[in-house]
Amino acid sequence: MSLASVLATVPTRQSYMHLSSAEKTVFYVVMAVSLALMIAQFLRRLPVWRKGVPIHWKPDPLGSIAKFILGQRKVQSSRPKSGAPMHLMIFYGFMALFLATTLLFIAVYGQAVGIPNFHKGAYYLAYESVFDVLGMLFVVGVAWAWGRRINLLRQHGPTVVNPETGKPEFNGNPLSHEVKDHLVLALLLLLGVGGYVLEAARMANTPQPWDYYAPVGYALSKVMPAISNDVYRGIWWSHAALVAVFFITLPQMKIKHIFTATLTAAGHNPEASMGRLEPITMAQVEETGRIGVATADQYTQWHLLSLDACMTCGRCTEVCPAHNVGKILNPKQVVADIARAAETGEEVAAAVSEEALWACTTCNACVEACPVLIRHVDMIVDARRHLVAEGRLSGSGATVLRQMAGTGNAWGAPAGNREDWMKGLNVPLARDGKPFEVLFWVGCAGATDPLGMRTSRALVDLLNKAGVSYACLGNEELCTGDPARRLGDEFQFQAQAEMNVAAFAKYGVKRVVTACPHCLNTLRNEYGDFGATLEVL
């Protein structure tokens, strides 16, 4: 039939076909109860989230949801060959099916409030064609996800729990393999395939001349035998039952992140920087009576919410350099441990283990990889701050802090030796009083480590040949304090920062060049909290 001929028949479809009034009532009750149970389970999580400290930043809910949820920004940047395309198919396929269901709901029930039935004619044909095809994204994506999970299980074997710690041992498989992980994918696949089976059954039961506008359902109907009314109703109720099961079990499955990740994105700090840690003030210490985080309820409410968004995908663990060289740190397990501590009230350091906390390099690779915006490093450093305040840091970390307090640098070199690398070079010093445009920030390694000193001398040679107007602070330069901050000694860092910022103000420093990546990050991203306005290169 031509399109004009099809439109002349006013194509549409009957809702609740072959269902009696009593069956419709039962359906409404079942859906209402299942939705109520789903909502109740999420509401039971509210007290856990509200234990935390209120956020102090102003979120951008619409912008963050558009970027990280609808745009899937973080998903696209990790696992580009497997996880990303698979998840994008599932997400956008799910969104298409959700939109299709919402439009159908409005068309059917909107008439009660005066909205005319628009689910017919050309709109209906377009609706059937577009959503029938887009729904296959969901089915293929879920099948891919389940197949990938099974393949990884075959390659690496099941997750083994360490009898001493009671925690899973990482065996090279980034995914966890609980039974419910497979059940949720089976349920999603049944929902997706079941929707097409139901559509095909409707066509086989009551053929219409426009059925071919839904190509997937139409093709499936051609291999079906004639469907009686009772068989159709049985298929319809089977699909409805799966939907009810989905609603009821959703809060207990990792698929719950469709809600919790959206809430996490809505509350995300749009000003959060990968390289900046949140400072602590003495006023905060006096108000709370603590430094850092001892128990999970001392994290912000947003951090506690973000823990529930974790779907244990393992992206964070895959990219963790400490984990990849055999250290105990497993960022995925850190999130699970803190989430457990939020439930039990256990000390965070005990739940995670102090060894794991100190193994973190604070590189933020885990944060960059996480598709649901969890800030692992913030939580780890806050726990470290508590340990340092309690005097529970020993070994090389404690040595670094003592050296920094005594000499002004993490290497323990005498403060008066920071100009030794300049011997034989014509290096201008800020204290000489000559005007300069750029401050060359040398850093502790550049001033005291033999290899670092070679780099500093080479950079001076380049600056001289380029005719740059520059100067160094020499012995007036102190460590930026970055090692102290990353280890958890926030106030040692702040003392160093304030002295350096005072030196910048003294010499009118506005532009800085440095060869040290750690110094670059601290000067560019963190010194602004202490009054410095710098362009750092």
Give short role names for the model-derived ranges:
Residues 38-56, 106-111, 144-160, 197-211, ...:
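Juxtamembrane/interface segments at transmembrane-helix termini
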Residues 51-70, 153-176, 210-220, 259-287, ...:
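Juxtamembrane inter-helical linkers in multi-pass membrane proteins
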